[in-house]
Amino acid sequence: MTLFDPERGRPIVAPPCDAPGCWAGAPGAYREGSDLYVVYRLRGPRPKRGYEVIIAASRDGARFDTVWSADKDRFGAESIERCAIAHVGDIWRLYVSFVRHNDRRWRIGLIESRAVDAFDPADLVIVLDPLDLGLAAVKDPWFRREGEGWLMFTSYGTLPLTGGTGLHDTGDALSTGRTISASGLATSPDGRRWTWQGAVLLPSASGWDSFTTRLSTAVRDGDGWLGLYDGSASLAENYEERCGLVRSRDLHHWERVNADGPSIGTVRGPGGVRYVDITAVGDVFYEYTRADGAHELRVAHTS
């Protein structure tokens, strides 16, 4: 099954440099009527890493203009990854995943604002902290509503059974090979106070997604849901995950559609797809691997 053809997608943000480790992507999409928003991050090779988060807006889905941005120093961060945006009543919300300089752990914070162009990183409040959850890391949030409440899906890493000494020395516990990198769920009545519910999608016992499974979005599929996730088989593929499909009746329990390999994009090399987000009307944003190894942000539409 193919929801969209990544080769036919249109590049909308180029990477900041033309080499592996140079990325524009990790998008979080939000549509409100005719207004389309995408929040994404820019990244350079180490030691720069994810250095800027940007919100862009479009009225026609073709031209995207920057309405807000902030560099990682304003968050006291070593790196920024996937973020999410939502508009609730008269309040805009920006959820940011970042590594703090002081302890080098991935966590998720929330900033609220009356306007989409007025977020102040000084107002950030931590909503999911790995120290509180007994985890090595938590990052890459995205959302769905469930009744009057909220579901937040994240990437997370478990603490190693052998102990955590040195786990955060690189500022990225998920890139050490010492954690289980899986997809988890938190629930909230209001989008501010969150309760961790645990795993919803774990790596397979063997195969192409046995190292990482990062659920990235979900769309309606009849009476249930079709989910897209990033998978990898080893630490060597950590920054070149591929896109697989899973199904769910309730957003809480997921089953793989194809265990043999990725379902969207190439198996390896250029043309790889990761960090997909899809709006309710079918706007598709994704990070795409170019021939030079850099990643660009593309937009497409579901078939």
Ranges and model annotations:
Residues 1-303:
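Carbohydrate-active catalytic/glycan-binding domains of CAZyme proteins
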